[in-house]
Amino acid sequence: MRLFLLFMTALLLTCCSSDSEVKAETNQYQAHMAKTLIVYYSYTGNCKAIVNSLASQITADQLEIQPAEKGLRYEANNYALGTQLLNAIKANPNDASSYPAIDPVTVSIDDYQNIIIVTPLWWSQMAAIMQTFLFQNRTKLAGKTVAMIVSSHSSGISGVVADAQRLLPNVTWAGDALGINASNHSNRNSLIENWLPTQNFHSSTTGISHVKSDVKKSKVYTLQGTLALVGQKGIVIKDGKKVAIK
């Protein structure tokens, strides 16, 4: 009995840590997020690494956007080709022919309530390939809850955010976009873990509209960090700090 009490005391102290609070919030996304699709384009592999980190923390399907013309080197000659594609979009942003062709999308976007965009930054703008996807699917994406993660070398992401808002005027933004650059790319797991609770994703459970604020109320959690069922024993967390056994 003494050993059991010591074990439970140690467990309670662990649950009081800020890291555990963040993980509890993230676990609630896994349990309560509505059906989610991660849409990404990755030229150098950085965005793919970000998607892998994101997918390890939430339950979501993935859709990789690919250019129709293969083998192009967008970075050659100081991104001359990439700049050319971006300039064509700038000149006529409402003309479908201004956007580079992409492979057909076979996923049914109608099946998803949450969309998470993961895109590279080219010369302070959204990569042209991702712009094509958003332009072509702006009607299907209308009414969705959308979040975004931007990969860049060092530039700020405000230009990419502006492109996204122009291309998707009728979506609900879940929150601020997350920028991940060369200096913090290796810390992407923790960056994403801290970012997720700041997003107001569409929930499959009507009783929970915002996981972050809900966690701060008195709730009973199992040892796995999920909400306990009625009558199920677990750990009571109140105001994110006070803990008891029920």
Regions found by a protein language model. Give the residues of each.
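Bacterial Sec-dependent N-terminal signal peptides
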Residues: 1-25
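Residue-level detector of functionally pivotal "anchor" positions at catalytic/ligand-binding pockets or at interdomain
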Residues: 17-18, 202-224
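C-terminal tail/sorting-segment detector
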Residues: 235-246
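Solvent-exposed loop/turn segments at secondary-structure junctions
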Residues: 43-46, 67-71, 121-125, 152-156, ...
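Glycine-rich phosphate/pyrophosphate-binding loop and the adjoining helix
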Residues: 172-205
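N-terminal beta1-alpha1-beta2 submodule of the flavodoxin-like/Rossmannoid cofactor-binding fold
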Residues: 22-117, 126, 193, 197
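Helix-loop-strand module that forms the ligand-binding subsite of alpha/beta enzymes
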Residues: 80-170
